[in-house]
Amino acid sequence: MKLSNGDISILIGCLGALLLVLGLIWLIRRLRKDPYPYERRPLLTDNEAQFYEVLRPAAEALDLQVLIKMRLADIMAVKSTEKDYMAAFNRIKAKHTDFILTDPETMEVLMGIELDDKSHEQDARIERDIFVDGAYRACGIPLLHVWNPMTTEELLDLIEENL
């Protein structure tokens, strides 16, 4: 079967039209795609917010500042002599501590507080906690693991014992 020039022109026209339609579909999808697929979320979970209401007066009684959800990489650094600097940094860059107590004047980190719950009983979380505990120990910063609920007085005593 031999195609005439007219048949070839029609075939090329159909292919061109198909490519045009596919290009338009791609363009419309791209323009519709939200470049900012983000939404606001609460800074603290309900459990964390409840604990914060107990922690805040305990910290105020000791004249301490409370910071929340601080990345480990913001409160500790990889030793400059570490050969595998990036590997060590990558281990701390995406982990955070629930609450940090600091000196309000110097902002020196005095203590970390992890609010534990049932998720800390999972194998991956236990492994993560062991690593974080070791990193805090290496930096000489006390790290408390606490469970909610707790009274302000109980927490105040626990903080004073470990500072």
Predicted stretch roles:
Residues 25-83:
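N-terminal topogenic membrane-targeting module
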Residues 83, 154-163:
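Short low-complexity, flexible loop/linker segments enriched in glycine and/or proline
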Residues 1-34:
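N-terminal signal-anchor transmembrane alpha helix of single-pass membrane proteins
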Residues 53-57, 134, 160:
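Surface-exposed alpha-helical segments enriched in charged/polar residues
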